[in-house]
């Protein structure tokens, strides 16, 4: 009976819990903003008068690009427990992919003669996992206001000018101004 429990505990530690944890993290990263517990500001708008709703809609429409960026950033934020779960999964993967000391001693002679491509890929994956574990996430810089380029005002369509430009016919004024 004890042997069965020990094997079940080992199975859970090696296979069940890391996969369950990875599935929970993957599922929670795809949760939209409203389901993650953050209140939706559009749903909390003041409904007492139609004028306030129109003003709220106007301000939202005027800064639509900024609000879109804010909404996108908030929906993909990762809280502390998600970070902890991701680091745990990455740590499990790095231990699972790390070469064993005994295996390295036995295969040391064979590795000096030739390095298998799968071994190179495994080491590259380990480097990537290590970088993911030690990398501190910094959100991208937000550029709030940019100068708009002044474009020349185009004159309204005039058939005489079009004929002069396209057909080469002198049917309009000598110059535009």
Swiss-Prot record:
* Gene name linked to the record: secM
Q: Which family does it belong to?
A: Belongs to the SecM family.
MF terms (GO), sorted A to Z: translation regulator activity
Job description of the protein: Regulates secA expression by translational coupling of the secM secA operon. Translational pausing at a specific Pro residue 5 residues before the end of the protein may allow disruption of a mRNA repressor helix that normally suppresses secA translation initiation.
User: Which cellular component terms (GO) are annotated to the entry?
Assistant: cytosol; periplasmic space
Listed InterPro entries: SecM
Q: Which HAMAP family match?
A: SecM (MF_01332)
* Primary residence: cytoplasm
Question: This protein is called what?
Answer: Secretion monitor
What's one Pfam family here? SecM
Q: Is Cytoplasm among the key words of this record?
A: yes
